[in-house]
Amino acid sequence: MYCDKGASSLANGLLPNVSGDITAKDNILDALDSSAEEHFWGRYIDGFEGQIFPQIPVSVHEAHLTGRARYEIILGNSMVTTLYTVSSIIRTGWALLVSQYTESQDVVIVSSLELPSQAMGGTILFPIRFRIRQDGRTEELLQSAKKHADKVLSSQKHDFPHTKDFVDPFSNSILLICTESQPSHSLEELLTELSASKKCALVLRCELLEDKISISAMFDPQVVRPRQTRRILDQLGHILKQISGSDMLVGDLDFLSPEDRQEIGRWNSRSALSDECIHALISKQAQQNPAAMAVNAHDGNFTYGELESYATRLAAHLIHIGVKPGNFVPTLFEKSKWTQVGILAILKAGAAFVMLDPSHPPARNQLICRKANACFALASAPCEPVLSMAVPHVITLSHSFMEELGRLQPPHEQKSPCLDPRAVAYLLFTSGSTGQPKGAILEHRSFAAASRGVVAMTHMSSTTRTLQHSSYSFGAAIVEIIATLVAGGCVVVLSDTERLSNVAASMVAYSVNWAFMTPSFARTVNPADVPCLRVLATGGEGVTSDIVETWASFVSLYTVYGSAEQSSIAAMAGPLATHQRGNSANVGSPFAGCYAWIVQPDRPEKLAPVGCVGELVLEGALVARGYIDEVESTAAAFPKGFSWRCLFPLHQEGSTRFYRTGDLVRYAVDGTLEFVARRNGYIKLRGQRIELGEIESQLKAVARQPYEFCVEVVVPKGETADKAVLVAFVALGSAYTDNEICESAISSPEQFDQGILVDVLGHVEERLAETLPAFMIPRFFFPLQHFPVTSSGKIARKILREQAAQMSVLQLAELSLGSVEKKELQSDMERYLRSVWVQLLGVPEDFIGANDSFFRVGGDSLKAIKLFQRLRRDGYNLNVTSIVAAPTLSQMARNCSLLD
């Protein structure tokens, strides 16, 4: 791109020497002719690994430079400003800032260059490529930028007409540098051309005046908000002052401007929380409204007075039999009214609860009990045998047991211990990278603060009727129960059949008006079918625009952010309106008692500039103490502190705690948080948090041979992101019949010995089901000869994901074990069910055998619900619980019956 006479012959550039050394490459232009120019620019851009800044949203079809902002900076005299031109300093400073916004060390910027009037004259645009190393020096970058511009100026004799084609891909932002001597008409014509192109969203016009630099920004407010543009100018000025002052390591640069620091401090200046115990807040509601309904369950109801009485009675019994403050007491119940009594009694006894899910493998629940060093536990009668294998004393909770306690127990024989709000309230286990679950330790004040935040944000009250839908092993279940009781509302407990099979009708029957759902589950519910619902909180996975469009006009819709280590819920945003569908990634601000910091992803000792993506670090009372008996994991995730913290004299209650979330976020213009992605091995799939390393460890433990496994989340070809699946890649080596296969290529079934594969892995799913919950078991197994590796010798996970994503669900299933040795159908019921599977899953009939699992051939938990609904319409009864427990076609045929 050019302006003024002869400019088309001069729009060219060189790849800057990224190491700072000047080599023979600098003379390449002298040897180029017109025919070689296109090839040169192709090689110049080849291998670019960065991103373009700014990213233009899909919704913005044309950029319009209607916004304006100004900034001035005075550069002092120094050795740097003497040796290098101000133009080189500006270009280098802009590249450094762009590297922060794009999270990349590979940066291409487009800048202008004024040609000498005695030559061709005019102003040209040319690309400059920087490779920025943290251990490199700023003077090396300055030297490279200056040498590159000098070479462009010295190559005026060449005519390179294709340069514009290589400028355009990087022209979302343009850096214009002009001097007082530059002809104004040249620059104005260039600005007119940029505006007319409707491709550029940000133009920085830097005027080099006698004693200062004046920067004028032209921008598209749809792409870069006015406030953020001002921040960009502040940040650029802050960088320019540093690199113009003296030579320094890139890693020592401070990218956080003084203005950024002030704003971050202001956003974190929230009032401190008041320390409280969870059970004390609930007891207060019982005292004020003893006749109000606290629990409305399929197996019975409790008023607040009854809940308080039963919990106090059970707490006294727990103390009497030896439960001490600080003990961990597991609970294992089907969905029941007694769960609420159990956890409240444990808290009143001074102990901490550990909620378990009976649908998880017994071995996993027993492992958690052992990790919690549990001596006492509460369970329902059907669940008691599971816990008795790991816990010495298991109390079977029931109405008759509680009535017996009332007869035997003298009133007020045992008093609940007076608890410090900093005492442990519960232990919540999540997936762990070591192959075993790890438990986050949460205090009373932590979850009391989180509950207060939810209550205030969503206007919970005594009229709230909350659906207790989430698994007991999921932090959302604790929110559903405790936040509701803190607000004086009613916890609605459905049976597993009601919850999994016909949740909408059940919500109406129980008059549910508040619910938490993952986006995946929310897609299975029609808002018109739940007219009683007033508030929907959604989280656990990315909230996409379709959720906002579907629900925002029917309910008050909120997005939720949190994890086990952050009291399960640390921030909320909403209520969202339908026009905010493009802002669905915003998760709001942390609740009182929690500060939000964003650090550079690979350099947590430095804060990220406002607007740049970084790792979220949370600080304060909402943060867990750490992981039980996991010293290394605790040290990695819960650092003691950061040097930058002293820059912010914010309120702190005693010793503070930090948690590195592993989530990549950015500050929005108003200081709220926008979720971007995960940065480590943790993923969330349909609301469930999963550590891929735990699955890989379990696969190695149960496989018959010491093969290598790699588990990844893959979005199959033709599917949307919410249809992602877990795929276990396995390196079989000698199991292949074709030893010449490319190691990074996806194999076909003919390329390996399926008999060996079945012999090695045929029992894996069954063994995994003994230790992992269903949502952690891979849907497909993907055979390879060897894993592709990166230059550093690590498994090239990206290659695995990309190549598997080129295959449809059907192709993945064919490649996996599900296609081996299909059994013929034997009954009319099997044939009927196969026809339903075909319609629901979109697979051919001959793809389904009697021994095929619904989940292996394309089903998932949400499609299981649709299967139940379809069968019910046809007059058959097969609930979701049965589908999950017995998923093969033949098993379903045996369990399916006619409706009464």
From Swiss-Prot:
This is Nonribosomal peptide synthetase AMT10. One of its GO terms (biological process) is amino acid activation for nonribosomal peptide biosynthetic process. Residues 284-686 are annotated as: Adenylation. Gene clusters encoding host-selective toxins (HSTs) are localized on conditionally dispensable chromosomes (CDCs), also called supernumerary chromosomes, where they are present in multiple copies. The CDCs are not essential for saprophytic growth but controls host-selective pathogenicity. It comes from Alternaria alternata (Alternaria rot fungus). Pathway: Mycotoxin biosynthesis. GO terms for cellular component: cytoplasm. GO terms for molecular function: isomerase activity; ligase activity; phosphopantetheine binding. Pfam families: AMP-binding (PF00501), PP-binding (PF00550).
